[in-house]
UniProtKB/Swiss-Prot annotation:
PANTHER family: DDB1- AND CUL4-ASSOCIATED FACTOR 4-LIKE PROTEIN 2 (PTHR44472:SF4), DDB1- AND CUL4-ASSOCIATED FACTOR 4-RELATED (PTHR44472). SMART domains: WD40. Pfam families: Beta-prop_DCAF4. Gene3D superfamilies: YVTN repeat-like/Quinoprotein amine dehydrogenase (2.130.10.10). One of its GO terms (cellular component) is Cul4-RING E3 ubiquitin ligase complex. WD repeats lie at residues 268-307, 312-351. Coiled coil: none annotated. Keywords: Repeat, WD repeat. It comes from the Eukaryota. This is DDB1- and CUL4-associated factor 4-like protein 2.
Length: 395
């Protein structure tokens, strides 16, 4: 694949995108007008056509803070719910990492500009897992799970997002900052469920730990394997967990941790599960493992209904991104290619090469949204690799 990368990049720059036969806007519109194509199918195929024609543009990073160095390499990015803020983890040459928030409202303008706020430098500490947390309001905090080091124990830390953005007239004051001492965590998830209000979960070695932030109360659920991926369902009282053994199981939050009645749905992969995404209705789940297998599960029938082919993963913790509004699944492989599939049908819509040669140290981190930059934003993909940000907007 690396030998094909320069040619693919050149074709993308020249906007020479090839789509499936019949997948062009005039043809689809004509079929819809003649009644040969139902409106729902027309909308779905139109979205897929736009995804296959995404165009790459470099994003200009304009810093308000001298400490936000543009030379720091992106390690991970994580967009909030509205996709108007981007939490970033940047690798520092001297050791350790910088954590910060980028305002993305500038993505709605033709210039494609973003603005980093002040950063927090943490020397010699590694974050194994992170997610946005809605403590005071939607995405008010960041939940970071730090690995222990020497005499410094591992912990889960809730950082208010306002800590990074700073103080401006009319802005909220920094919210609650708190830390919980826990064993080294492989994964974490914040609950939006009424059955675990103001709570988060951490996936540990052969254990799931559920913590209430307000009361400090903790519940432990024993497992037979390390828990590498987690997500709370919103519509149902379940916490889903993906394990190193390949098992996926749900914890019924109504049952407590006594006995074995808390273990609900059980599914299985052939390798370690690295990512879980529950669809909004709570009836379907997308999961991936360390063999590159990505599956869509029907949770009511407890069976796989769709498989997404082409993802490359041999040993890494790589996330899978699901956007139901656009009807797509996106994932970056160890080969540094970003692939986007149709959520419903599973066929590959587009393959995006990295702007840089493939390397284990240069695997892109991406975010996909229907509204990049906020409410008035356009659909597309945001990619962070090395020191650069790229936006792949719909054509």
């Amino acid at each position: 694949m690396e030998s094909k990368r320069p040619r693919l990049l050149e074709e993308a720059d020249k906007q020479k995108k090839t789509v499936r036969v019949g997948l062009n806007a005039p043809s689809m519109l004509r079929k819809n007008q003649l009644g040969f194509l139902r409106f729902a199918n027309y909308c779905r195929i139109a979205r897929e056509l736009r995804v296959s024609c995404m165009q790459r543009k470099k994003v200009q990073i304009h810093s308000w803070d001298p400490s936000s160095l543009a030379s720091d390499r992106f390690n991970r990015i994580l967009a909030n719910t509205n996709t108007d803020q981007l939490f970033t983890v940047n690798q520092v040459e001297a050791g350790g990492s910088k954590y910060g928030i980028i305002t993305m409202r500038g993505l709605t303008t033709p210039e494609l500009r973003v603005y980093p706020h002040k950063t927090l430098y943490v020397p010699n500490r590694k974050v194994n897992s992170m997610c946005w947390a809605s403590l005071n309001h939607l995405d008010s905090h960041l939940l970071l799970c730090f690995v222990g080091l020497a005499d410094t124990p591992s912990c889960a830390v809730l950082l208010p997002a306002s800590l990074f953005i700073g103080s401006f007239p009319g802005m909220r004051r920094p919210g609650m900052l708190c830390s919980f001492q826990i064993p080294d965590a492989w994964s974490c998830a914040w609950s939006l469920s009424i059955h675990a209000y103001h709570s988060f979960s951490t996936g540990l070695s052969q254990q799931v730990l559920l913590t209430n932030v307000v009361t400090g109360h903790q519940q432990s659920f024993g497992t037979s394997s390390d828990v590498l991926a987690q997500q709370f369902a919103i519509m149902t009282p379940l916490l889903f967990n993906g394990c190193r053994s390949g098992e996926i199981f749900g914890i019924d939050l109504r049952c407590g941790n006594q006995g074995s009645g808390w273990k609900a749905i059980c599914l299985s992969h052939d390798s370690a599960v690295t990512s879980l995404q529950i669809l909004q209705d709570g009836q379907f789940l997308v999961s991936s493992d360390m063999t590159g297998t990505i599956k869509l599960w029907d949770l009511r029938a407890t069976k796989c209904v769709t498989q997404y082919e082409g993802h490359v993963n041999n040993s890494a913790y790589l996330p899978v991104h699901v956007n139901e509004e656009e009807g797509v699944v996106a994932a970056v492989g160890q080969d540094c290619y970003t692939r986007i599939w149709s959520l419903r049908h599973g066929h590959l819509l587009t393959t995006i090469p990295s702007p840089y040669p493939a390397s284990e140290n240069d695997i892109p981190s991406v975010a996909f949204s229907s509204r990049l930059g906020g409410f008035r934003g356009a659909p597309g993909l945001l990619m962070a690799v090395r020191e650069d940000l790229y936006c792949f907007s719909y054509g």
